[in-house]
Amino acid sequence: MNTVKTVRELRAAVARARSEGKRIGFVPTMGNLHAGHAALVKKAGERADFVVVSIFVNPLQFGPSEDLDKYPRTLAADQERLLEAGCHLLFTPTVEEMYPDGMDGQTRIHVPGVSEGLCGASRPGHFEGVATVVSKLLNMVQPDLALFGEKDFQQLAVIRKLVRDLNLPVQIFGEPTVRAADGLALSSRNGYLNEQQRAAAPAIYRTLRQLGERIRAGAEDFPALLADARQALEQAGLRPDYLEIREPISLRPGVPGDRQLVILVAAYLGSTRLIDNLSVHLD
């Protein structure tokens, strides 16, 4: 595995791989990697011949009161994990390399519709930052395919629409959420939880599953279902930010009669905000 820091080095390495007839797979990350990231890299290796991973903590997607400064930087451990997972090229740019004219002067990309509401309402500007950095990275790497985790469901919807609307020549894959044995979705932010909070956290997925089972059993009073689920989260010690039932492509509010739904949740344990989701298929 080679590690490069500049766009010039990145493009040269990818060009060499492509000249050898290799199919390029790409996994963008912010580092502090866990088994979920490793699964994405391994899956990229199954679908492509040459796997590129980026590690960049993108300031453009953090709000002024969010955890940019305390977000863990664990490059040495990340490199070891990536080597084991089968990464061929690691791109670790600086902020200056990504935004040479500064962030205030950076062209930004807004993806309408799917970026609004849910995390878009709670984190103004977040998806603009995500769409901008992903667009830049896809242009820098120019992969045949890119992989993202389904845990960040709204982010995946934003990226799919971005790629579709801008006719970017890349195939986007969403990969299933990797979970701990107790159901908690793996996340770099789980490390912020103390012992008591970590013990309470599995209530998120447990509540999603219970809500999904009720919908599959035929319950159609979505407001009442959501009220019960919010109460269950609160009783477990969580503070819900949002809990909603949506249609999975457009992310419009789900209605009885929809055959494909996704339940999305964001909830706080202390100051740590965790997200998760559950797809519900009624066919």
Swiss-Prot record:
Q: Where is the active site?
A: 37 (proton donor)
Endpoints of the signal sequence: none
Q: Which residues of the sequence carry a binding annotation for (R)-pantoate?
A: 61, 155
Pfam family membership, one: Pantoate_ligase
Q: What is this protein called?
A: Pantothenate synthetase
Q: Which InterPro entries match?
A: Cyt_trans-like, Pantoate_ligase, Pantoate_ligase_C, Rossmann-like_a/b/a_fold
Point out the coiled-coil segments of this chain. none
The record's subcellular location field reads: Cytoplasm
Query: Quaternary structure per UniProt?
Result: Homodimer.
- What does UniProt give as GO cellular component? cytosol
Q: What the protein does?
A: Catalyzes the condensation of pantoate with beta-alanine in an ATP-dependent reaction via a pantoyl-adenylate intermediate.
What organism does this protein naturally occur in? Pseudomonas aeruginosa (strain LESB58)
- Enzyme Commission designation: 6.3.2.1
Which controlled-vocabulary keywords does the entry list? ATP-binding, Cytoplasm, Ligase, Nucleotide-binding, Pantothenate biosynthesis
The biological process GO terms on file are: pantothenate biosynthetic process
Family assignment? Belongs to the pantothenate synthetase family.
Q: Drop me one GO molecular function for this one.
A: pantoate-beta-alanine ligase activity
Chain sites annotated for binding ATP:
30-37, 149-152, 178, 186-189
